[in-house]
Structure formats: C-alpha cells, structure tokens
C-alpha cells in the first residue's frame, strides 16, 4: 500500500473493525498490534500498572504473559516495553524482545522443557519477530491512527470456519499461540491458533475461544473475502434449511 493510500485509509479503521465484527462475530473487538522500532514516534500512553515482586530468578512483568495484553487491548490503547512482557520468556522471544540464547537461560523456559510440554526443537522452530522492538502498542482497531502490523481477533469455531473458507491457505497453529503474531508480521500470512494451556490459564480465555491474526496490510482484502464467504454460507444455510423440512 502506498503512503497516499495509507493517508486516505486512516479514517477507515472504525469501518473495517465493524465489518470484521459483522463477518466473524468475535468475542471481543479486533485488537491492533504495532511494533515500534527505536526512534519511532510513539503517541500511545504507557499502560500504568505495578509489577509484582520478582520470583527467585528475578522474573516479573506487568502481566503474567504478553498475551494478557490482547485482552486489555480490546478496550484501550497503550504502549508496552520489553520489561512489561518479561514474565513470559517464550512470548518475549516470539515478539523479538529476547534472542533464543537469552530465552534459553530463563527459568520458565527450563520449566516447560523439563515438563515435556514442549521441546527445544519446537521452540527453535517458532516464527519470531526479527527486529527487536522498542515498544509494542495494543489497542482497538477502531481507534487506530495508522496501519497496524497485525490485527488479532478472538473468535469462535464458527468464526474459524468462516475465516478458513475465506482464506484457504490460512495456517492453523497450536502452542504457544503468541507466535501467530510473528507469522502475520513477518510472513504477511493469515493464521489462527487453537490455543495454548499456559495462555488460556493466564488470559482467562474461554474454552470455546480461538485466536486469529491478519496482517495490517491485508485487512481490506481479507475483510472483503470474509464478507463474500458469509454471503455464500448464508445461501447454503438457507438451502439446508429448506432441504431439512423433508425430515421434520
């Protein structure tokens, strides 16, 4: 998208948010996620929250894991730093705040390895944000003032079906879930995750919720495809309802 198109689309984020919500019926508003490099202007306020006491290894953060910011970002816009994300070392790694070597020294990463929940090869193969950010900004897509890098939605099984129909090449991932943000940003790909036990415990996501991500630069394209898919699905539902009358 050209700079001229970006300027002309600045006021379209509320409309795109509404269209996404109508098509996918998410459980919360779409969240815009923007990665800010050192030296870039950050207009979003810092999220003010105290840090709990660090554990015996010195690990703490503003929230139990960075995925918790997804929950807050549905209703407020704020900027976060590496320290804010630091209680979850896997999330800090996938978001570019830690290198693989740094993450491997953290006690929570050792804990997941020792438990057998995930192995080193799986972590080494995770997609990650390649450039360390100065900050990550979260907020409702409807309130965005510029194109976000990624838009994240919490959706149902119905929403996942609709998105997969609209974007057949969409990736469907498992744990640790946060890596789908890196997939969208670095690979320009639409992706979804069935979730992760750690993330569900920390965020309070309901069992029926899933997460999906759309690259900011593909929002218009994907939204249009979703709307076309919804129309087709409605016609099939109507057909099935008429056909089912024979069984009444």
Locations of the language-model features?
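Acidic, serine/proline-rich low-complexity intrinsically disordered regions
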Residues: 3-248
